[in-house]
Amino acid sequence: MTGPITRKDLMIVNMGPQHPSMHGVLRLIVTLDGEDVIDCEPVLGYLHRGMEKIAENRTIIQYLPYVTRWDYLATMFTEAITINAPEQLGNIQVPKRASYIRVIMLELSRIASHLLWLGPFMADIGAQTPFFYIFRERELIYDLFEAATGMRMMHNFFRIGGIAADLPYGWIDKCLDFCEYFLPAIAEYQTLITRNPIFLERVEGVGIIGGEEAINWGLSGPMLRASGIQWDLRKIDHYESYEEFDWEVQWQKEGDSLARYLTRIGEMAESIKIIQQALEGIPGGPYENLEIRRCNKVRDPEWNNFEYRFISKRPSPTFELSQQELYVRVEAPKGELGIFLIGDRSAFPWRWKIRPPGFINLQILPQLVKRMKLADIMTILGSIDIIMGEIDR
């Protein structure tokens, strides 16, 4: 009598695109051997909207409302990179007051983005309580945004040569009060989360990335700094007025999910330091460069023709892009957000290439989850911090 034949079949599981832990419309095709992950294939494109092609058929001013739909949780950074590119292309000077206000808004947006990463990340690994504490602080930041820009999200606040409006009366004091309140809140997170043995069991030693490996994969932001590489564009490129403030680059050397968590927690405290220094030293003066707001190009009489209204011609230009190319980048919450811009002496970019940090960082996911358990996929994916709006564009 022969014994039973044991078969070893692999199981293929689809995670997403409608899965609460995917952080957007991301689909993962996971090959499993029991609970062990054999392979993982990310499927992208569910949120593709042709953002680069739209940019090439719009003036910079017309395109500004679109860019807040890339990373819709850190919209100040997408606005900053959109106006920094033509500013450098046209050698436009930004008033010091506008530069300080930009720094304040960027760092507030960084804190809000990290908070909205931390809450769902904790929920993914089974900790529901910190989620509500974290959203309490995030709501205060959105109140500050609403008072200054009129919008809680999708602010449309940055302009070429400055910002849309000056800070309202009493806003600086309100923001300083928030900074004093938020620093003890970070210590509260440390007590609730960092010293929790169950949390440490889920994240420590999970998804390890070495320093050389992180560089070879093109990682940036907290993903790179958590692997021992002290690389922060705010220190390296000296854009806006970051060189005038005293702060430290946050980094860890372990390269695991815990290191990425600690890096982002430290960045929130450093952002508060930058905001406090900017608020206390904010100069007076104008908040925009009025000269570049004027159109220097002579209007074409053809634009007034009756037939012109019906043939889908482009509107009159607002800012002429010189015939050259450049790459501009900023340190966004998720990593290096860049724009490759080619001008051709018109108001419309000849080429507008977006370098999204989440898209680059997501590439390493299949390698990180191999030979891990199925439950570790949520931990590793959450530690990467992705937003599908900027990944699919």
Curated annotation (Swiss-Prot):
Catalytic activity line of the entry: a plastoquinone + NADH + (n+1) H(+)(in) = a plastoquinol + NAD(+) + n H(+)(out); a plastoquinone + NADPH + (n+1) H(+)(in) = a plastoquinol + NADP(+) + n H(+)(out)
PROSITE patterns listed in its UniProt record: COMPLEX1_49K
EC numbers for this chain: 7.1.1.-
Membrane protein topology class: Peripheral membrane protein
Pfam family for this entry, one: Complex1_49kDa
Localization annotation: Plastid, Chloroplast thylakoid membrane
Top EC group: translocase
Listed GO CC annotations: chloroplast thylakoid membrane
UniProt keywords, alphabetically: Chloroplast, Membrane, NAD, NADP, Plastid, Plastoquinone, Quinone, Thylakoid, Translocase, Transport
Main location, first listed in the record: plastid
Keyword Zinc: no
UniProt xrefs under InterPro entries: NADH_Q_OxRdtase_suD (IPR001135), NADH_UbQ_OxRdtase_49kDa_CS (IPR014029), NDH1_su_D/H (IPR022885), NiFe-Hase_large (IPR029014)
GO molecular function annotation: NAD binding; oxidoreductase activity, acting on NAD(P)H, quinone or similar compound as acceptor; quinone binding
Taxonomic superkingdom: Eukaryota
Protein purpose: NDH shuttles electrons from NAD(P)H:plastoquinone, via FMN and iron-sulfur (Fe-S) centers, to quinones in the photosynthetic chain and possibly in a chloroplast respiratory chain. The immediate electron acceptor for the enzyme in this species is believed to be plastoquinone. Couples the redox reaction to proton translocation, and thus conserves the redox energy in a proton gradient.
Protein family per UniProt: Belongs to the complex I 49 kDa subunit family.
Binding partners and assembly: NDH is composed of at least 16 different subunits, 5 of which are encoded in the nucleus.
HAMAP family documented for this protein: NDH1_NuoD
Name of the protein in its database record: NAD(P)H-quinone oxidoreductase subunit H, chloroplastic
Originating organism: Fagopyrum esculentum subsp. ancestrale
